[in-house]
Amino acid sequence: KVLLKSRPFEKEYSLYIGIPFCPTTCLYCSFTSFPVSRFGDRMRAYLDALYKELAFVAKHHRDKKLTTIYIGGGTPTALDEECLSKLMNMIHELFPVEESEEFTVESGRPDSITKEKFRILKEAGVTRISINPQTMHQETLDLIGRAHTVEQTKEAFLLARECGFDNINMDIITGLPG
């Protein structure tokens, strides 16, 4: 009760944006996601539809404070650089990003991360990223259909630091096969 009373929920909101694309579909995943190899040609159409929905949300929340933005998925960094940049521009056009307390992007899989994508996110004001290896055991990564290595995870983390990110989450799942 104390926590609920500490925030003026009637006057603020958080924004979640789902990006339903991934490099591949992982064995354990229950989220709606579409492999880029089969559905990548639909990214631009998805962003066009997403713009309409975000514009609707922005219009109906003008009188409230945007406290947090969270972009998840899927794997948002499965978007190519052009689409990722377009997404960031849409958000900035429609929402007062600079007023938010936190702006998180699930960078997700190390095999979808590039220096250019991190640059786009950093310039857009992203304050927190997630790099999600799910495990640091190569055998398990292979069994669950993750097309990246443990070494790529380490490299992605160091690249994030190099690009100026100091709030980095890393998801590890226990109980995976292997």
Regions found by a protein language model. Name each.
Residues 18-33:
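Local cysteine-cluster metal-coordination motifs and their immediate loop/turn environment
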Residues 15-16, 72:
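Short, well-ordered beta-strand segments
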Residues 14, 21-24, 39, 150:
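Short linear sequence motifs
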Residues 12-14, 26, 102:
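Structural motif
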Residues 33-178:
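Conserved non-cysteine loop/helix-boundary elements of the Radical SAM core domain that shape
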